[in-house]
Amino acid sequence: MMQNNRNYFIAIALSVLIVLAWQFFYMNPRLEAQRQAEQAAKLQQQSQQAQTTQAPAAGAGAAVNGSLPAGGQTAPTVLTRDQSVAKTSSSRVVIDTPALAGSINLEGARLDDLRLKTYHETVDKSSPIITLFSPADTKDGYFTELGYVGSDATGAVPGPSTMWTLSSGDKLTDKTPVTLSYTNDKGITFSRTISVDDRYMFTITDKIANSGQAPVSLSSYGRVTRYNKPETPSAYVLHEGFIGVIGDDGLIETKYAATEKEATTPAKSTGGWLGMTDKYWAATMVPPQSTAYDARFSHFSDGTPRYQADYKQDAVTVAPSQSIELKNLVFAGAKEVPVIDRYETSYSIPRFDRLIDWGWFYFITKPMFKLMDFFFRYFGNFGVAILCTTIVVKALFFPLASKQYASMANMKRMQPKMEELKAKFGDDRMALQQATMQLYKEEKINPIA
């Protein structure tokens, strides 16, 4: 017994030493490096903002000659969200659903003003509701945008500076979609219908009609752009940054800092989704699932530092007097498990549930969560839910535990006979081992159990 206790305390001491060594030699240097990197990035950001405060806004031009238009640099002045929205109120379409409030900027048809009605900044219900998206000329600009890349033959196609016209609807709700339109000088008409459900999924359907005399080819693009990193403290136990499920590359999770060194460019793919995720919220885009596209996670340091997840699809051709239709999805909201699971099923979005970081043991953590969530919804109390989950898990493992306890009882019952064998064979370890194994066999005891 004393020997067993000594081994037990040695094991505890070694475990503590391993944890302390890991903290001292691995975590502390890593935390210090992160602190220095954040401090350097902050100084660089302050320097860049000081240099560009008098510069005009850039990156607002339309897409031309096959290039993806720039995401926009810093604005001449930094406004609050309310100031920016008020400045462009005449060219905005209001969004009002049970879960969302905000507006769409007709310039670029950009979704850059979005708040979550049912979530607050603190547990105090009187605190401000969460702001997810903000215009580019605010301190923490964050938005999504869909556009096109054309050529000289297509003329000017929708891009960041395109001024769309509201052709039907006056407010975007979960029951009333809106339609925007734009016609260029080559006779190509773009009609964009935007709808949203009662939670967080936007459906953007573009109809492109060619009334010209020659076929035209153009590529659609989509992007999620974010100015500066979120100010919330990062956590090592979950991923915050770029995320996507892209073709054969599968689930891709890239930290913001990683793209500051080199952009992440997965292989050309068909199907999937991409965007950015925070601890509780996310913004992702789901391109048309039947057309190949090139995806990219990148960082731009010109002007205000910004991060961008974007894709550009292979070109499609619209014949004269013909039209085509493209449908994109945009998720922008809270990472609610039932909602995300429903979207994965109803929209056939591959592995969309991985938008939530379930950790390495996804096959264990998600079922455990669903079980606990079921009990919470039934009883309305997390303490009771945890207790019920513990009982269920214990019940599932009861047969295994029962065998273990039975084996331990048998081993205890055999202890006197074991002592007799030790006294009989003394230092003859080989004979003692053979006699012990024979005893286990006769008594039908499995010591491993």
Tell me the role of every PLM-derived stretch.
Residues 24, 43, 188, 321, ...:
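Membrane-interface amphipathic helices and adjacent TM-edge segments
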Residues 1-395:
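Membrane-protein biogenesis/insertion across secretory and organellar systems
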